[in-house]
């Protein structure tokens, strides 16, 4: 913002003439490092509740007997198993029941969670069960943020897909709030062009996409 003000004062820049605007931010990364993100719960396939604890069984220093892995962003008591099952072929073996989802949701809200992350087995192949549970939660708790791993990062490998969705749910409210303020200030200063946000892979995305997929 300071640079924009300097260009206006020194060179007579008209913000309305700006045709390309890209912004990079570390708000999401800082949120993870500082561990001050959103209070969220994880709903996963029943009997796979240890996905974040097991991870890839790697430790930071393999030859150090005292090496400790970082604690998961979601503690084990906020991980809830849902009775559902998708086969690796994408065929539904067990469809989720609303009563089961409602019980898990009630427990998550009672624990103080303000958002839900969904990551079911094989949802990268077929997101039907995840999207069904997302719709149930949106009906039972309107306005509660819900992140689906199948929508966020639909790739094979359960831990990688789950942790990506968890990070997205963890940082999304903070990133969205930051981008809302950022866009408001720029528009107030007269910038009218589309606002692009730098992605972690070096590309760019629109600001609306950045709000929805904060982990990218």
Language-model segments: residues:
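N-terminally biased helix-coil "hinge/interface" segments that flank
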Residues: 1-216
């Amino acid at each position: 913002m300071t640079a924009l003000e300097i260009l206006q004062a020194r060179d007579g820049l008209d913000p309305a003439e700006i045709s390309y605007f890209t912004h990079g931010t570390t708000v999401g990364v800082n949120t993870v490092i500082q561990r001050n993100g959103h209070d969220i719960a994880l709903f996963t396939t029943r009997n796979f509740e240890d996905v974040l604890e097991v991870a890839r069984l790697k430790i930071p220093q393999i030859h150090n007997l005292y090496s400790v892995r970082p604690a998961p962003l979601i503690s084990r008591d906020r991980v809830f198993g849902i009775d559902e099952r998708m086969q690796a072929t994408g065929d539904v073996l067990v469809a989720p029941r609303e009563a089961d989802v409602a019980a898990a949701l009630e427990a998550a809200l009672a624990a103080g969670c303000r958002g839900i992350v969904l990551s079911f087995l094989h949802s990268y192949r077929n997101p039907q069960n995840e999207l069904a549970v997302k719709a149930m939660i949106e009906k039972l708790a309107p306005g509660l943020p819900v992140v689906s791993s199948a929508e966020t990062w639909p790739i094979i490998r359960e831990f990688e897909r789950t942790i990506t969705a968890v990070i997205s749910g963890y940082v999304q409210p903070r990133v969205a709030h930051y981008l809302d303020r950022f866009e408001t200030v720029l528009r107030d200063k007269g910038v009218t062009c589309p606002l692009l946000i730098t992605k972690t892979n070096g590309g760019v995305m629109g600001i609306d996409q950045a709000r929805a997929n904060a982990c990218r």
